[in-house]
Amino acid sequence: MKQKTSLFARLADGSLVLQILVGIVAGVILATVSKSGAESVAFLGELFVGALKAIAPILVFILVAASIANQKKNAKTNMRPIVILYLFGTFSAAVTAVLMSFLFPTTLALSLDAAQASPPEGIGEVIHTLLFQLVDNPVNAVLTGNYIGILAWGVGLGLALHHATDSTKQVFADVSHGVSQMVRFIIRLAPIGIFGLVSATFATTGFTAIAGYMHLLLVLLAAMAIMALIINPAIVYFKIRRNPYPLVFTCLRESGVTAFFTRSSAANIPVNMALCEKLKLHEDTYSVSIPLGATINMGGAAITITILTLAAANTMGIQVDLLTAILLSVVAGVSACGASGVAGGSLLLIPLACSLFGISNDVAMQVVAVGFIIGVIQDSAETGLNSSTDVIFTAAACEAAERKENA
């Protein structure tokens, strides 16, 4: 029994990336060797997607309400330039993702029998739908997966509880922690679920499906590379008026590489703090901006949400006009700020963005499952971009403030 327990503990504490890779390889091998065997394990993928579908609405509602209710009062005003950079950078990432999706449209191999989309006519219908989703009954919003309504009621409850007693806030913080633990447990089952998903995908659609995933992954990585090597340096140059690349490459090397392998912005906070100290930044500033950046500076997440959502829209045959794409950029940017600290957080917020286009929760969750399949690389690159940008923008704001003082 002890041996079994230790084996389970080793599996639970092992590298999720390696386990997912094993699941993908095992699924491909099974589909190659035995098509019937691959089809028989498809239920593992369905169970995994079902668990995600069940927990996601509760997760969004509780996390949003708890984070707003427990927000610190009297935040330092000298954080404003950095916060503006964080938000602008996240929105820029979403816009970059929209442009990449328009230039290199992607479609996915999804099962569309279960639910069909009712595509919106344009921005007017999208806004009309959005307004009525906002005022949906909160219980119904959770039951039906109406993420716009969930987000609205979560924000409303969080604001209402912002002035509540500390004990009430602590209850919400504890519930939020509990839900996050449940999500982590479900994510630990990802290798088994992905094994079932990959087996079923290759058994039913053949190996042509991987071409779609490779195209999607290349578009995602290209958008993140453009953000890291072109957009971020341009933003930094605007602030510091000198060559930004020495700073950018230092941050990518010393923060981005570590974050790529840890796949956690929160886990990379100590690394970023040490880098800020090495860069001789103001401790009073970076001690606040780095943890804040791990929460709201989510350019990589905005790219993931936008590209996967537009891939879903393309797959469903929905024509996306420019104004709707801009609205998606805003929604993706705001949603990305809520992706922090949640395992697979950016993927679980895809249904919220998909709801803008009338895409059903069933189809959206299949897109989330595709995200988990490519997540071995996508999530690592996303975290590397997010975390390194925290230091880049903090350093740029500090240098700009110093230059202004010395002028």
Swiss-Prot record:
BP GO terms, sorted: serine transport; threonine transport
Segments crossing the lipid bilayer: 14-34, 48-68, 82-102, 141-161, 192-212, 216-236, 290-310, 316-336, 363-383
GO molecular function: neutral L-amino acid:sodium symporter activity
Coiled-coil boundaries: none
Cellular component per GO, a single term: plasma membrane
Name assigned to this protein: Serine/threonine transporter SstT
Subcellular location: Cell inner membrane
Membrane topology: Multi-pass membrane protein
HAMAP family: Ser_Thr_transp_SstT
SUPFAM superfamilies linked: Proton glutamate symport protein
Function: Involved in the import of serine and threonine into the cell, with the concomitant import of sodium (symport system).
Matches recorded under InterPro entries: Na-dicarboxylate_symporter, Na:dicarbo_symporter_sf, Ser_Thr_transp_SstT
S-S bonds: none
Keywords: Amino-acid transport, Cell inner membrane, Cell membrane, Membrane, Symport, Transmembrane, Transmembrane helix, Transport
Catalytic activity, as annotated: L-serine(in) + Na(+)(in) = L-serine(out) + Na(+)(out); L-threonine(in) + Na(+)(in) = L-threonine(out) + Na(+)(out)
